[in-house]
Amino acid sequence: MTWTAPTPQPADGPLRGPDRPILEGYLGWERATLLNICAGLAGEQLAAHPLPSSNLSLLGLVRHLAKVERIWLRQRAAGEPVEPLYDRALGKDQDFDHLDPDEAPGAIEALKEEWLAADAAVAGLGFDDTVDVHGEAFSLRMIYVHLIGEYARHNGHADLLREAVDGVTGR
């Protein structure tokens, strides 16, 4: 039987109240949306580059967002000394390049594991806590807003990629 990407449980969060549960809920929703868009596709479909003008693929987006989570929440916000997921010496787009369809199940699991590790890394931080990012003070709140924007942008790309792969829209 051919492996296909699993369908995630829908994420839900509060509609009012303090910033943290709202932003955590919205980030969770964006995270689940990416996996929803990928759900049911085989590794070959996830690794496909269906738009001739772009190196984007669904598998590349999964890998990219795992890298983004690690950088922003674990390395920058929490100060964890974790290794980068991809070697920048090989090029800045290693998350999108040299994709192996057989690695799709592992990439999706790695993304989910990165979510858990990232959430745990910042659980003890306050939303007003700041970290220096290239000479600018970023609050954890701003990092969450940045990540939500990053996911929203790439989920739009993912919608187009999914439609180009198999015609499915609106996931």
Please place each PLM-identified region on the residue numbering.
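Acidic/histidine-rich alpha-helical segments that form the ligand environment
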Residues: 92-131, 141-147
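Short, contiguous alpha-helical
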Residues: 1-12, 20-39, 43-93, 133-171
